[in-house]
Amino acid sequence: MSQVYRSTRSSSEDTKSFEEAVIQGLAEDGGLFLPAVIPRLREETLFEHWAHLSFQDLAMEIMKFYIADWEIPAPELRELIERSYSSFRSEEVTPLRKNVTGDDENLHILELFHGPTYAFKDVALQFVGNLFEYFLERKNRDVSEEERTHLTVVGATSGDTGSAAIYGLRGKQDVSVFILYPHGRISPIQEEQMTTVEDENVHTMAIEGSFDNCQDIVKSIFVDEEFNRKHNIAAVNSINWARILAQITYYFYSYFRATDGQPGRVKFIVPSGNFGDILAGFYAKQMGLPIEKLVIATNENDILDRFLREGVYERSEDVTATHSPAMDILVSSNFERLLWFFAREQLAQGDDQEAGSIVNRWFEQLREERRFDVPEHLLDAIRYHFDSERVDNYNTLASIRHIYEHAQNPERYVIDPHTAVGICAANRQIAHDQNNEIHYISLATAHPAKFADAVNEALSSYDDYNFDDVLPDRLRRLGDLEKRIKYVDNTDVDVIKSIIEEELINMGIYNP
């Protein structure tokens, strides 16, 4: 299948190839790339042919719809997929822990933390790193050293994206990676994972500010045409379409495991910040996977929950620090892709260009007025697919304790605070629905050892709890390694660009 990509803010007919969309990351107009067509699969394909496939085979079947064979031939795509998941600690890649609290509730936990950095983002970023390497090897084949293409990857992280990006790109030829994170606002283990990597192509910057400050810097860099031209800036944040694509697979995979390969009633509960993870679930639903509802679980930074309730997308004045810091955001970057879809369906009569104009107006209004609202019928259309729950700090810790006390498969199961936000939301859905025919799949987005402070606060009063039992040896050893960090007490984008350029000069990659 041939597939092209367009910008969420474009009113033109211009499109990009998969390679262009992945390497560029963010469109020239500030929009996000998305596929022009979402394939729709027949029920027969899903439940007779796909239901019992391995994770890797499912990924292959899904990605073939979004990556044209002329861009990546099928044998080479399969090799990329196999290599991307070879470092995961589970043969299933994303195993589903079924009926965690007993058979009556049908509460299943999808463990997404079995990759090299113990976070769900490994599922996407191991694949993205190999994609970058594949495209660069092909582009640089048979060219002189002076003519080689070099990518400069720039990303912002609230914790797990940074380490997953670094582990996906470390040591890759012709790639330099610069990760910005808010100083003092990520967990010690997350910082250690990013800053103890010795590969020379990896650079970390601790910024005095919030995650949104870091993200705004990155977005400003991406729309700077001159800086892009000089340094071939590329993205690994959740704005990169390849990340969404890689995450679609585990919605199919876990659905089939929960229902034993049969059609069934399934709700997915997804801890949500930048909306990339749950957006992948929406694409799975649009492809034909019969998901009953996608439940957005937010913490106290609740722009998504407020939108679902009121139809107003409004940026708060400041970020609230919570026990689930990866979700401490003001603006949910990937939500723009969902808005484009519903603008096209509900307001633009299926016209891609008109949908782009509408989304562009909304985000201009957000930039100028910090808010915009949408028509009620568009909001109703979104509510048909989505529900939302807001979970505060108190209930986050209470959910960690609840699972620890009530888990049966296994007993004394420990979850991280982001997963706990999802579990709290799932339990509310279970209590509301009172229907044991529904399967509730709650996404476990990180290993609990990555968030020691919150887990210890929740569980330290239990006599049989010891954090040392939770901490994997690989993470324990990070504390003994030397850190490489550049501290930046300025959120001026020009300062950050100067630092990046200086490092590229020092590495002999850029000669001004």
Curated annotation (Swiss-Prot):
Keyword Lipid metabolism annotated: no
MF terms in GO: pyridoxal phosphate binding; threonine synthase activity
UniProt record, GO biological process: threonine biosynthetic process
Cofactor: pyridoxal 5'-phosphate
Amino-acid biosynthesis is among the record's keywords: yes
SUPFAM superfamilies the UniProt entry points to: Tryptophan synthase beta subunit-like PLP-dependent enzymes
Pathway the protein takes part in: Amino-acid biosynthesis; L-threonine biosynthesis; L-threonine from L-aspartate: step 5/5
Pfam family, one: THR4_C
Modified residues (N6-(pyridoxal phosphate)lysine): 121
UniProt similarity note: Belongs to the threonine synthase family.
The name this protein goes by in its record: Threonine synthase
Organism in which the protein naturally occurs: Eremothecium gossypii (strain ATCC 10895 / CBS 109.51 / FGSC 9923 / NRRL Y-1056) (Yeast)
Lineage: Eukaryota, Fungi, Dikarya, Ascomycota, Saccharomycotina
